[in-house]
Amino acid sequence: MPFHPSVYPLCTAMANEWREMRHQLENLAASLCTDAAFAERHVESLQLFDALAQQADESAVLLDRLSGGMHSNEALSLVRLDMMQQRLGAALGELY
């Protein structure tokens, strides 16, 4: 079942929001890492910024694929983060 045409530009806009979020996360992490002592004490927490940035990027790419008209199953199969793919796949499975 195709989406209503208004969904496609919304997906594109949401993808851009996710990219902006990634950019802001990366900037925040970089500013926190300027203090070497802080970065050393909080290295595991700072790694979470990278994980969140990757998740935001994958979300943006997924939304781009959907806005381009790719079928949701195909778009989901291209997600590179396994846990994210599994969670979204479970949600998609509930719809069919």
Language model features with spans:
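Sequence/structural signature of long amphipathic alpha-helices
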Residues: 1-96
